[in-house]
């Protein structure tokens, strides 16, 4: 794990695009001057595997906890010159030149996250509708089509096409009171596996295995860990109530991805990708937990366990993260866990307090992390170090 700390080491500064870009630049291997367009395909190791997680799939099978996109091609409106009034009155929302969608119903109460999600899906469909050649969706776009969340709230649309391609800008979107900035339509070059693209909802999309390597090699560190953790969770069909089998499946998936990566030779981003694949954990159940995993791994000198089971008075509790030797637990307070209405929130809150009391009575220290704290990883790391230092009565030295 020490090697992971060396790769993911960050200065104590807020996580923003510039600092992350600098970090990623430092993490790139010395051969970054080589062309990224070189195609290198490797067959992922699947022989004799008891679990089909790494075998190429076809069709529209749902994987693990994935959810398909809500929008379909039928939601698109092709603009033919007679929609000016509808655009001006915001009945239609332009998502790409010549393509719009109908304004969502009850848009005045539309949550911010749903507005961004709708725009991201509409942009993918609009690109597919208007491209005059075969297009395969990759990276964050592939994740959304597979039904897996990505960290970027407003992701670029990533595609792979044969021949040359000039990146372009997809316009900003105004949806009710939400202003969604413009994003790039960009092309990736080459593939890293022999898995064939899949067709999901009429869209050609990279396999999850290909997407995992694309994200591990090319995405920013935080985005990469979140993406690969989600993909490994889906491929291994992780179930915390069946952990021995789930962990074996997780190891198979990871081994296949690492074998594929190591067979690629010397390529930019390989050091980061190996660290990402090693760190990523199928036991993270939500995108918030995946982000917290990254924060913990880049600051803690201890081995972190996910979904650690603790039995108290015949009750089993699964801790999001734990340092068992110190009896320290880290719990992420996500929105989904707390329910969607007042009554369910109150029930969840009472259960949370009861759970915390039982854990503390059993000698555990529970450190809670809220969603808002993930927005400033430097401050979150400082908090985590401070709390753990108090528990150990000694300062914690973050690995260099």
What are these regions (language model features)?
Residues 4-7, 13, 301, 329-331:
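Intrinsic disorder/low-structure terminal segments
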Residues 53, 73-79, 244-400:
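Surface segments flanking catalytic/ligand-binding clefts of nucleic-acid enzymes
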């Amino acid at each position: 794990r020490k090697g992971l700390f060396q790769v993911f080491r960050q200065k104590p500064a807020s996580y923003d695009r510039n600092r992350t870009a600098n970090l990623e630049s430092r993490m790139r291997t010395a051969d970054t001057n080589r062309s990224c367009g070189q195609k290198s395909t490797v067959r992922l190791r699947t022989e004799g595997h008891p679990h089909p997680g790494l075998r190429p799939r076809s069709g529209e099978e749902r994987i693990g906890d994935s959810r398909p996109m809500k929008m379909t091609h039928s939601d698109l409106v092709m603009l033919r010159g007679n929609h000016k009034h509808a655009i001006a009155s915001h009945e239609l929302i332009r998502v790409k030149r010549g393509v719009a969608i109908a304004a969502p119903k009850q848009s005045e109460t539309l949550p911010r996250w749903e507005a961004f999600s709708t725009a991201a899906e509409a942009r993918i469909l609009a690109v597919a509708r208007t491209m005059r050649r075969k297009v395969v969706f990759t990276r964050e776009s592939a994740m959304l089509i597979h039904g897996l969340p990505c960290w970027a709230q407003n992701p670029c649309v990533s595609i792979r096409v044969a021949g040359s391609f000039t990146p372009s800008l997809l316009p900003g979107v105004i949806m009710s009171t939400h202003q969604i900035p413009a994003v790039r339509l960009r092309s990736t070059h080459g593939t890293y596996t022999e898995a064939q693209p899949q067709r999901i909802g009429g869209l050609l999309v990279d396999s999850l295995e290909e997407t995992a390597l694309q994200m591990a090699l090319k995405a920013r560190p935080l985005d990469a860990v979140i993406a690969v953790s989600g993909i490994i969770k889906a491929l291994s069909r992780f179930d915390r109530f069946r952990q021995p089998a789930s962990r074996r499946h997780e190891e198979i998936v990871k081994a296949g991805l690492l074998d594929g990566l190591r067979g690629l030779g010397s390529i930019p981003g390989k050091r980061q990708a190996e660290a990402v694949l090693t760190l990523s954990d199928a036991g993270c159940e939500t995108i918030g937990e995946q982000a917290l995993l990254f924060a913990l791994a880049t600051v803690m000198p201890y081995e972190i366990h996910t979904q650690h089971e603790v039995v108290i008075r015949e009750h089993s509790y699964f801790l999001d993260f734990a340092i068992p030797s110190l009896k320290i637990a880290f719990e992420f307070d996500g929105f989904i866990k707390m329910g969607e209405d007042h009554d369910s929130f109150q029930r969840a809150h009472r259960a949370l307090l009861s759970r915390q009391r039982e854990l503390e009575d059993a000698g555990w220290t529970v450190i809670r992390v809220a969603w808002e704290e993930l927005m400033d990883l430097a401050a979150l790391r400082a908090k985590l170090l401070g709390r753990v230092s108090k528990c150990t009565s000694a300062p914690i030295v973050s690995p260099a």
